[in-house]
């Protein structure tokens, strides 16, 4: 089985509530059961540099909206056997 887990937060990268605990632990447990899990979340500005420096840039692209040409980047970090993909966009995720 393949699972793409989308979340707004995950431990240890960023935490504001209980969702981060689940998003940080559930994928690890599913992997132990043989599930192929990938986690996708925003690349918030407040994610610690110790994690950011280990991320690999996968791609970047632009989305044309009515009023602007919007950048989005995709970064990857394998952490504790889980592949995390971070979506970079300063306008939406450049906050703490």
What spans do the regions from the language model cover?
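Cofactor-binding loop segments of dinucleotide-utilizing enzymes, especially the Rossmann-like FAD-
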Residues: 8, 42
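A conserved catalytic-core segment of Leloir-type glycosyltransferases
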Residues: 43-96
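Low-complexity, intrinsically disordered short peptide segments enriched in small/polar/basic residues
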Residues: 19, 32, 60-62
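Hydrophobic anchor at the start of a short beta-strand
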Residues: 35-37, 84
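A short, Lys/Arg-enriched amphipathic alpha-helix followed by its capping loop at the start of a domain
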Residues: 25-35
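Extreme N-terminal starter segment of soluble prokaryotic enzymes
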Residues: 1-3
